[in-house]
């Protein structure tokens, strides 16, 4: 029987593009794990996708996963749009390349390892898991800003 894991993800960016961070809260039974990271020059959408990918990547065995995101871009991209993107060789219906295809492909590769339900949650609306993921993403973003300051 697969274990159940609940994941909350978020991304944050100072400017778009600009320094950004991603964060995720993973809950399993009574345990939880917080992860975050950053990129020096990125977009909010890239950070949203990265948060989900990094959270799934650390799961060591097949799990039943509920992923909560406040990003409609992430939720709709991975549950609806991606099927046509794959069919159209990572192009949209207007033949333009899909933005962030590199990250969508990495995230898609993780999907087959788990049974996943994607859920949208309103951001900044008193959802404790979303608030925790947001704080982690902001921590990542602030780390990126500090790294840039140190580089002058």
UniProtKB/Swiss-Prot annotation:
GO cellular component, as recorded? cytoplasm
Task: List residues of the RNase H type-1 domain.
Answer: 1-142
- Give the main localization category: cytoplasm
**Cofactor binding: number and manner:** Binds 1 Mg(2+) ion per subunit. May bind a second metal ion at a regulatory site, or after substrate binding.
Q: Which PROSITE patterns match?
A: RNASE_H_1
Show the catalytic activity.
Endonucleolytic cleavage to 5'-phosphomonoester
Record-linked InterPro entries: RNase_H, RNaseH-like_sf, RNaseH_domain, RNaseH_sf, RNaseHI
Which Pfam families does the record cross-reference, listed alphabetically? RNase_H
Sites binding Mg(2+) 1 sit at: 10, 48, 70
In the Enzyme Commission scheme, what number(s) does this protein have? 3.1.26.4
Q: How does it assemble?
A: Monomer.
* Biological role stated in the UniProt entry: Endonuclease that specifically degrades the RNA of RNA-DNA hybrids.
What this protein is called in its record is: Ribonuclease H
Tell me what organism the protein belongs to. Answer: Rickettsia akari (strain Hartford)
